[in-house]
Amino acid sequence: MNNVTGGHRGDVGIEIAPETADDPALAARIDDLLHRTCDLARALTGAEQAALKVDLDGDGRAARKFFNLSGRYDRYREYRVDPVGSGLHGMHIAAGDVIRLTQAEVEQHPAWDAFGKQAGSHPPLRGWLATPVCSEDADRRPYGLLQLSDKTDGQEFSPDDAGRLLELAAFAGATLDALRHAVARSRDARR
């Protein structure tokens, strides 16, 4: 089941498996973080598209995903599909790494599947800049993937864009850690 969340211009939020999410307040905080992170990612890099999916508990029960699209992509505002993590989106990217691909490199990449069954309805991928959002804990557990596409004016993403995205992902990971720890303390206090 997908519910649309958000309400900010450019946002498309997907709540994945909301019937199993047991903490609406946490879900609202995560939605706000996703919205702000996607919005900042676009502002910092000049991207026309940003997407971020996180799974705070690691079991898929409260997974959330946001897209933030420029006006150029208005026709994709109704696109609502649970991400399956295939193709480029399923690549393992180590904590602290960024993948930066030009459009030609996207199309030549062995993991590129042109969105499989969603090819006709998925927003196009015009270049790709992606990094994991990870916990600051020792295990650096990945919460999700922050990804951008289509730099304004047809430019390619730069090394500076990659650095800004990496810093933003680290900030988002630290914020998710704080949310996760606050929820754990709250649950422990209720017991």
List each model region and its residues.
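Allosteric cytosolic regulatory segments
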Residues: A162, L166-A174
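Signal-transducing coupling segments at domain and membrane junctions
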Residues: D74, T102-G127, D150-K151
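GAF sensory/regulatory domain recognition
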Residues: D39-L40, A51-V84, V106-E107
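Signal-transmission linkers at sensory-effector interfaces
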Residues: M1-R36, L40-A43, T175-R191
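A short, aliphatic-rich beta-strand micro-motif
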Residues: R126-D137
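Acidic/proline- and glycine-rich, intrinsically disordered low-complexity segments
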Residues: Y73-L101
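Short beta-strand-to-loop transition segments that serve as allosteric relay/switch motifs
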Residues: S135, L145-Q155
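Glycine-rich acetyl-CoA-binding "A-motif" of GNAT/NAT acetyltransferases
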Residues: D139-P142
